């Protein structure tokens, strides 16, 4: 972690400052191309080189990510997962004259309650506490309580006279985007999805599971069409929805879970398409029993028949402060627990226990049946062997963990089951003899302990009396994150998984010190799983393909199960998304779309000049070699989180909209309210402004 080693940071964010060193107040996730950009652009034609595939005509690629409204203080608590949601998209419009495809760039803030409140008040810093504040071991109980009560105070203030935008939901909608049943939705786990309009990326309103704000009222709603949350004092928490909902490409159902601080902690919902309301198919806020506590739960697995909830030992619990722990805390003495249940029967959950880990993203989930008829549910996920990323993405030095390899026994008294596992500090490493050290130095701070690898789990459902993890090992030794598959192969046994990697470090550390993605990977998961089973890979610590990034790049065999596209020097990519070629018969026949930034544009200080721009690259996903087109954008796109491809049919099939959210309308209403109320209202607004400035 070079940044952490070479720079003294603030006492609250890093370590004790050296008395002779003046610490540079620069946060790696607020500088360079991580720095937010505040210019928004309506649909603007772009130039391009190469040939744009006809499959893209009429569609749009959109990527979501955190983009803080203000970041003047580069030394303050900040985390890569913080920030107001901003969408950046490229639409491919067909010209009416010559029929050519014209790419058009657009980017817009998502107008959440927090964003609108922040822009129409005198509040100087984010309304919500930073994740950094919650995970920092040096954060005192007073600091956390102050940040929490400050948020509560500002939420209450936003509901008093003079506010034209009350804060009813605390989501920044900065995580991902998806399409379901005529709606494009932006997500974040601190609130419900937010509907956006394509291709303009305007904000429509919050989606509550039945309808979105800004849509025409539903004339007839079914008796079971209840919204997220239901009723009760804690109903607002049951609106909090995963940042990664899953849409079944066959049935059109959208699967979601809602994660809260209160038992039973997790609820699940299944929303069918509006024209397919078979009895029993719609579920809203159904409890998943057996979750061990409040968890930082970012993703889940979903096959055509089953859902997998991950109860990992990474807690997100305000009550931790009473126990002398951080609100977000990782406990490597506890196991990882995977709850598997039929899609529409969460009450039938079965819990599988194994070694502790962190998983932020799943790649794919599918059902399989042996020749004897035994049923298994399979999961591919990006498995981290530590919680390092949670800390380093906030520029915090991770807690030191002793390396332990003794066997532990953990029991769940509620279920009267026991889980015995070897607490391995890492997945099995190929070690220096295979050349891995060329890219991943084996040091105290950067070794297998911090690796993130594409990992295979097989949950055996054949024996009702025993919950057994039949297989669990890594497919490859290389770092692998931000996974995706061909959309119409999701929830089935997809052969290929696409994702990101890095040639300079490992993801657990690299993302934290703001290293970037310079490799895109295509992994033949089906072949690697078959090899793993044939070689009887070691449970938990096994690794099927032990080659390093360097070795794979040197070999580049035609039949290699791992193909890597390496970007040119100083060029860095973001998460790729697959678009299939028309009438394709082979699973990998299509294109990968992703944003690219050339860091040779950076100033000597490491900052981006105003003239810096990004590109959208279109890569042949079959040979992972040919860049068929590059779209030159009018501005840069900061490194962000997740994107998706919206087809022309998606855009044309959007539900009607009556109204859109607008910052200008909110500002105008505020001015009209003040000017129409005489001196009393003006005096109140003066007092209100002082209160806002007083709390920052």
From Swiss-Prot:
Q: Which Pfam families match?
A: RPE65 (PF03055)
Q: Where along the chain is Fe(2+) bound? A: 244, 298, 361, 642
Names of the cofactor(s): Fe(2+)
Which EC class is the enzyme in?
oxidoreductase
Q: Which reaction does it catalyse?
A: all-trans-beta-carotene + O2 = 2 all-trans-retinal
The induction comment states:
The expression is subject to photoinduction.
| Co-factor binding details | Binds 1 Fe(2+) ion per subunit.
Recorded GO MF terms: carotenoid dioxygenase activity; metal ion binding
Q: In which pathway does it act?
A: Carotenoid biosynthesis
Q: What happens when the gene is disrupted?
A: Does not impede neurosporaxanthin biosynthesis and shows a significant increase in the total carotenoid content. Leads to increased expression of carAR and carO, but not carB.
Instruction: State which Enzyme Commission number(s) the record gives.
Output: 1.13.11.63
Keyword terms of this UniProt record: Carotenoid biosynthesis, Dioxygenase, Iron, Metal-binding, Oxidoreductase
* Spans annotated as Disordered: 1-27
UniProt-listed InterPro entries: Carotenoid_Oase (IPR004294)
Compositional bias segments (type: Polar residues): 1-16
- BP GO annotations: carotene catabolic process; carotenoid biosynthetic process
Q: What does this protein do?
A: Carotenoid dioxygenase; part of the car gene cluster that mediates the biosynthesis of neurosporaxanthin, a carboxylic apocarotenoid acting as an essential protective pigments and leading to orange pigmentation. CarX mediates the cleavage of beta-carotene produced by carAR into retinal, the rhodopsin's chromophore that is involved in the regulation of the carotenoid biosynthetic pathway via a negative feedback mechanism.
Q: Which family does it belong to?
A: Belongs to the carotenoid oxygenase family.
Protein name per its UniProtKB record: Carotenoid dioxygenase carX
**Species annotation:** Gibberella fujikuroi (strain CBS 195.34 / IMI 58289 / NRRL A-6831)
Originating gene: carX
């Amino acid at each position: 972690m070079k940044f952490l080693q070479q720079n003294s940071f603030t006492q609250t964010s890093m370590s004790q400052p050296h008395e002779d060193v003046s610490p540079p107040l620069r946060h790696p996730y607020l500088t360079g191309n991580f720095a937010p950009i505040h210019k928004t652009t309506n649909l603007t034609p772009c130039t391009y080189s190469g040939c744009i595939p006809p499959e893209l005509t009429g569609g749009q690629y959109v990527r979501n990510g955190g983009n803080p409204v203000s970041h003047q203080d580069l030394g303050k608590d900040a985390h890569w997962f913080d920030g107001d949601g901003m969408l950046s998209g490229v639409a491919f419009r067909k010209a009416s004259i010559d029929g050519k495809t014209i790419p058009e760039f657009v980017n817009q803030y998502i107008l959440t309650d927090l964003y609108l409140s922040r822009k129409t008040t005198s509040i100087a810093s984010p309304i919500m506490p930073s994740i950094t504040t919650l995970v920092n071991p040096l954060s005192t109980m007073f600091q956390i309580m102050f940040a929490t009560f400050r948020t509560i105070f500002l939420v209450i203030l936003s509901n008093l006279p003079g506010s034209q935008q009350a804060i009813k939901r605390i989501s920044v909608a900065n995580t991902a985007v998806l399409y379901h049943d005529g709606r494009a939705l932006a997500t974040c786990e601190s609130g419900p999805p937010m509907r956006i309009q394509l291709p303009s990326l305007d904000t429509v309103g919050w989606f509550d599971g039945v309808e979105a704000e800004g849509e025409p009222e539903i004339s007839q709603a079914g008796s079971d069409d209840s919204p997220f949350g239901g009723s009760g004092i804690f109903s607002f928490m049951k609106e909090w929805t995963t940042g990664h909902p899953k849409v079944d490409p066959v049935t059109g159902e959208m699967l979601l879970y809602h994660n809260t601080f209160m038992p039973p902690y997790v609820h699940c919902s299944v929303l069918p398409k509006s024209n397919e309301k078979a009895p029993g198919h719609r579920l809203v806020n159904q409890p998943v029993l057996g979750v061990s506590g409040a968890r930082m739960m970012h993703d889940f697995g979903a096959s055509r028949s089953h859902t997998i909830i991950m109860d990992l030992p990474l807690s997100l619990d305000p009550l931790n402060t009473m126990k002398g722990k951080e609100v977000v805390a990782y406990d490597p003495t506890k196991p990882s627990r995977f709850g598997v249940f039929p899609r529409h029967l969460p009450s039938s959950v079965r819990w599988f226990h194994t070694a502790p880990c962190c998983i932020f993203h799943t790649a794919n989930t599918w059902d399989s049946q042996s020749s004897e008829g035994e049923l298994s549910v399979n999961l591919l996920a990006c498995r981290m062997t530590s919680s390092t990323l949670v800390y380093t993405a906030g520029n915090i030095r991770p807690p030191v963990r002793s390396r332990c390899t003794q066997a532990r026994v953990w029991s769940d008294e509620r279920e009267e089951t026991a889980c015995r596992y070897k607490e391995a500090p890492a997945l099995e490493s190929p070690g220096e003899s295979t050349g891995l050290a060329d890219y991943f130095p084996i040091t105290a701070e950067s070794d297998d302990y911090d690796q993130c690898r594409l990992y295979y789990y097989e949950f055996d459902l054949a024996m009702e009396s025993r919950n057994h993890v039949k297989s669990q090992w890594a497919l490859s030794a290389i770092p692998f994150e931000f996974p995706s598959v061909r959309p119409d192969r999701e929830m089935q046994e997809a052969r290929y998984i696409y994702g990101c990697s890095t040639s300079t470090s490992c993801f657990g550390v690299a993302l934290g010190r703001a290293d970037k993605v310079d490799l895109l990977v295509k992994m033949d998961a089906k072949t690697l799983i078959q090899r793993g089973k044939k070689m009887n890979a070691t449970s938990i610590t096994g690794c099927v393909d032990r080659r390093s990034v360097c070795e794979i790049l040197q070999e580049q065999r035609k039949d290699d199960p791992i193909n890597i596209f390496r970007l040119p020097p100083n060029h860095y990519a973001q998460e790729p998304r697959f678009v299939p070629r028309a009438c394709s018969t082979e699973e990998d026949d299509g294109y990968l779309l992703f944003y690219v930034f050339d860091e040779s544009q950076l100033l000597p200080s490491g900052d981006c000049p105003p003239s810096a721009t990004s590109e959208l690259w279109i890569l042949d996903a079959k040979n992972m070699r040919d860049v068929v087109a590059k779209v030159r954008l009018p501005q840069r796109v900061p490194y962000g989180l997740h994107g998706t491809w919206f087809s022309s049919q998606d855009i044309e099939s959007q539900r009607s909209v009556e109204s859109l959210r607008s910052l200008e309308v909110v500002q105008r209403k505020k001015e009209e309210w003040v000017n129409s109320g005489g001196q009393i209202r003006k005096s109140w607004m003066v007092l209100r402004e002082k209160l806002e400035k007083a709390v920052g």
